[in-house]
Structures are given as structure tokens and as C-alpha cells.
């Protein structure tokens, strides 16, 4: 008979790997909070900035336009510099961009900030690598499920909390700016907390990095066609 499997120690924060899991899903949560902070505030932003319907629709495209290529780029950076530094820098950078979006005075400024904020969607790949470094094979599935599931909840919290912050807490014409700017400040502060409390691997383990980046070799026309199709989303 097989020994009974121990329950996943989700709240055993005295264990280093569990602490890292909570720090990591919260980082992912904050990236989604930033990424979707503007969605429920678009009616207020539209009125305040005198935007047209076409301009509002443009934000929907700009919000995700950079995400796919950014995930590839961030993945390369994670391999080279490690998830701890990569996540900390991404949080700080996107926090600054979020404040820039909140302070924008023209549609063009809003559009540029919104486009660049698509970087936040790349945070997902960082946490996947970090969690896999900290958890054994028998636990990595549930750990990554918690990371992804709880982190994604940031989008729902953004939808609920942003109008409350903008209207009830801050109020006035610039309430939406203060609400969105606050999420940027939170991200910047958390980037420091994350960097100071997380390591790439458990104590004594080695973080393996690629020895050298090289081009992907293809040897047949069929492989070349497959490679082109695989990369089409980057340019669409």
C-alpha cells in the first residue's frame, strides 16, 4: 500500500518554499491589478480626457499588443538574470508606467503608456520559473495552480476596487488618476519587498542558466514553415 499523501501546507509560512509561493502569487496579483486598473474606469477616463469611442476601443488593442513578444523577452531575461531580479524590475518599471498613465494629459500619452503596460502580462512566466525552482515534482503542479489562480484574481479585484477608490475614496474629476496612480505606487513598494524576501532557489541549490544563447536551427522546409508559423503572433 502507498503511504498517505500529506496535504499541501498552504499556510505553513514557516517553510521557506511556502513563503516564496505567497510572495510570488502576490507579485503576479499586483501585475494584473495594474494591467486591468483602467478597465472599469474607462467611462470616467473617457469623459475626463474627452475621448472618442474609437480611441476607447484602441485601448483594448494596445493593452495586449505588447504582451506576447514581452513574454518571450522576459523569459530570456529570467533565464539570464533569474526570477528574483526580473520580477522586481518588472514590478518597479510597470509601477512607474502606471503612474505615467495616471498623469497623462493627451490621448497620445495615454496610448503610449497603455501600450507599454502590456509588459505587465509577462509577469506570469517569471513566477512559473520561480515556483518550479522551489517545489519538488510532487508539489509543483498545485503550487503553480495556486500561483496562477490567485494571481489572476488581481484582475477581478481591479474591476471591483478601482471605482470605489476613484469615486468614494478620492472623488472629484481626478479620482481616476489617483486610483490608478496608487496601484503604481503599490507595485514599486512591493518590488523592493519582493527583492528583499525572495531568492531564485532554495538555500544550497544552484540556479542553472543557459551557457550561451544561439539561433534556432532548422534543417528542413517543413521545420522552417513551422518556425515561421510559431512566430507569427509576435508580428500580428
Label each residue range with its predicted role.
Residues 2, 195-222:
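Flexible cytoplasmic inter-helical loops of multi-pass small-molecule transporters
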Residues 19-53:
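Extracytoplasmic
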Residues 36, 63-72, 122, 156:
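Residue-level signature of mid-helix packing/kink "hotspots" within the transmembrane helices
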Residues 69-107:
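Conserved MFS/SLC helix-loop-helix module at the cytosolic interface between two early adjacent transmembrane helices
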Residues 97-101, 117, 194:
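MFS-fold secondary transporters
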Residues 106-114, 227:
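Short hydrophobic/alpha-helical segments at membrane-entry points of transmembrane helices
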Residues 113-151:
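Cytoplasmic helix-loop-helix junction between adjacent transmembrane helices
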Residues 147-200:
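Helix-loop-helix hairpin linking two adjacent transmembrane segments in secondary transporters
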